[in-house]
Amino acid sequence: MILTMKLVHPLHHSLSSSIPFPSRKRQSKPYRCSLPSPGCEKVIRTETVLPPAPVSCEGRRVLLGCLLATASGILSTGSAEAVSTSRRALRASKLPESDFTTLPNGLKYYDIKVGNGAEAVKGSRVAVHYVAKWKGITFMTSRQGLGVGGGTPYGFDVGQSERGNVLKGLDLGVEGMRVGGQRLVIVPPELAYGKKGVQEIPPNATIELDIELLSIKQSPFGTPVKIVEG
């Protein structure tokens, strides 16, 4: 009687003893994904990549160290800039209203930092970062989200508040700023959410805006975010 024996490899091979196999790619069907821009679609093909040849533990440690060092260098620049901006805003928020400049329309502003770039005038297409606060509590901001420094700039044309496309206080507050500047604006109710209020903001509420002018462009820049509700 002849016995046939099969050799079964254990499931827990170490990385160093695994048998390398060449990478293979399996292409799947394309799918469509909607993009932020209206009416814009892009066909994206996905690929399923099977595991390549195993890498030794030592090699993985070296690679991981390099990746962490690179990521740390990239993130530190954006993070340092964001911290510097928020610190300036915090110091300015403690200033008395008497230090602010009052415009005829009731808007009050204080330039935390005066930029040295182009000036935003009516008709300029601008990109800004903003933080909107009510009684010191942030209720809306463009700084929160993805990206190295966090958030996505908000782009709009100065003067569009007349059409209801942008909050009046933000529109009027950015006018006269220069690229690279940061401004704290106290917005009266009539230039904010008026007698109706919006969500957690009550009627006749005065709000504050921390605005940083990033650039002035001739082409669209930033992601439009509706900050006028109702």
Swiss-Prot record:
The keyword Transit peptide appears for this protein: yes
Keywords: Chloroplast, Isomerase, Plastid, Rotamase, Thylakoid, Transit peptide
GO molecular function terms attached to this record: peptidyl-prolyl cis-trans isomerase activity
Enzyme Commission identifier(s): 5.2.1.8
InterPro entries with a match to the protein in the record: FKBP18-like, PPIase_dom_sf, PPIase_FKBP_dom
Location of the PPIase FKBP-type domain: 123-217
Record-given protein name: Peptidyl-prolyl cis-trans isomerase FKBP16-4, chloroplastic
Organism of derivation: Arabidopsis thaliana
